[in-house]
Amino acid sequence: MGHVLSFTHCKDAPSTASSTPDSCPPEGEEDDSPVTEVNFWPLPSPHEPTFSYITIGSTAPLSRPPVRARRGLGQSRVHAAPREETEEKEVKDVVTYVLLEKTCQLKKLSPPHVQEEVVFVAKPQPQLEVFRAVKDLLYWRDILLSAGCLTGVTLSLLCLSQFSVISVFAYGCLIILSVTLTLRLYTKLLHALKRGNGANPFQYYLDADLKLTTKQAEEITARVLSLLSTTICTLRSLFLVEELKDSLKFLVIIYLLTYVGAVFNGITVLLLCVIGAFTFPILYKQHQTQVDHYVSLVSKKGNAFRSKIQGTVKKPPAKQK
């Protein structure tokens, strides 16, 4: 703690050259004025104060020494206990005032702003979820689900190859409804015999949320319209020969499809595609090294043949002598 100078002001004098009077009060009078603090900056008044004594201490008012009667007057000694109690009370009042002032200043301060860390979690996109589900289905991650899908699609295509679409749809709905209705009646019977709770065995699928929000419907509609418009524009450029090279490639592909159509119909082609989709991924996963080796050999042969053809076509004719 730093120290400051505390002074007791007695009287003003016109000059500092005059003698300093006695700091004790005159006879029969007691000085009850509190001890004051004097600023160290120059006083604006031309008069210079004189001081009886200098004390080095803290910023709080200091206690004065007990006042004694001047010698030769025969007065009794003045008791200093009441003055000390008064000065201690003044010190407590000053400390209380300072604490209240600091409390008011702290209340005026704004509370500290705690910046919370915001973690952004990437929302899974519907396209990625659909792609992951199809991949799991084709790689037989869930054997029962993959086997059920393959069997159902294969039987549906075989039925379509023999019957009309309306007949296949009607018989398929009858088969599904007969299975679900039988299971539901069975659970009701168990509940009547007090062997079950009678809950719907398909409650899990009934609780599944299949509704599309407005935003999802707009996204799907925009995606379908974009795909449709892109397909129409591509077919227009191919049929109207916007690029000669692309139109010739399209012509070759259509010509090869005529031979495929002569051997297979559309249902048979779809059936082969479905069987291949559920078969080739798992076979490739089991024999990946051998398949990659043969594929690299075929690609090298194809690149060599292509470079040979391009060299023959771009070879300039020999100059005649």
UniProtKB/Swiss-Prot annotation:
Protein's GO biological process: intracellular protein transmembrane transport; negative regulation of amyloid-beta formation; regulation of D-glucose import
Start and end residues of each stretch annotated as Disordered: 1-36, 65-85
Transmembrane segments: 163-183, 250-270
Its job: Inhibits amyloid precursor protein processing, probably by blocking BACE1 activity. Enhances trafficking of the glutamate transporter SLC1A1/EAAC1 from the endoplasmic reticulum to the cell surface. Plays a role in the translocation of SLC2A4/GLUT4 from intracellular membranes to the cell membrane which facilitates the uptake of glucose into the cell.
A GO term from the CC aspect: terminal cisterna
Keywords for the protein's UniProt record, in alphabetical order: Cell membrane, Cytoplasm, Cytoskeleton, Endoplasmic reticulum, Membrane, Sarcoplasmic reticulum, Transmembrane, Transmembrane helix
Keyword hit for Cytoplasm: yes
Species per Swiss-Prot/TrEMBL record: Xenopus tropicalis (Western clawed frog)
Topology versus the membrane: Multi-pass membrane protein
Reticulon domain ranges (all copies): 134-321
Signal peptide: none
InterPro entries on file: Reticulon, RTN1-4
PANTHER family per the UniProt record, alphabetical: RETICULON-3, RETICULON-LIKE PROTEIN
Primary location: endoplasmic reticulum
Location(s), subcellular: Endoplasmic reticulum membrane; Sarcoplasmic reticulum membrane; Cell membrane; Cell membrane, Sarcolemma
Lineage: Eukaryota, Metazoa, Chordata, Craniata, Vertebrata
Keyword Nucleotide-binding part of the UniProt annotation: no
Underlying gene: rtn2
Name of the protein in its database record: Reticulon-2
